[in-house]
Amino acid sequence: MQLPPLFVERIRHQLGAEEAEGLCRALDGEQPTSVRLHPVRGEQARLAVSRPIPWSERGAYLEARPSFTLDPAFHGGAYYVQEASSQFVERLLPADVEGLRILDLCAAPGGKTTLYASKVGRAGLVVANEIDRKRVQVLADNVRKWGLGNVAVTCGDAETAARME
């Protein structure tokens, strides 16, 4: 990937030459594929895991990117393909989230929504709102595939969602 020269110049100024060079190499390199395993069905996934994601209880980096669309475990919700950085929100949740209610305002395609649903358990509730009608179906499909039954999918603006009880 060719980074814009102005960006490279700016980060060299802000970070120094050595650190900027390291960042450019990282941005230019191939990013590892990561997944998050379902809390119940995760053992059904037959994936070549290279290492766990340190900040995610059920997250893992894969040795190589498989053809997910050909994997029945993927279609059965045994795991969710999700960038490791998106799984960091797990660290931001309180230690005891069992039974909490969470509002996810920009929920599609559903990665963080299913993460929240796994953490709050059956006693909790996640309201997954997506303002873009074109993206709601993908969200609903991913929530259905995850199958925990503690997520309500809505389509509205933040003001409408804020009035929900």
Model feature map: region roles:
Residues 1-165:
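S-adenosylmethionine
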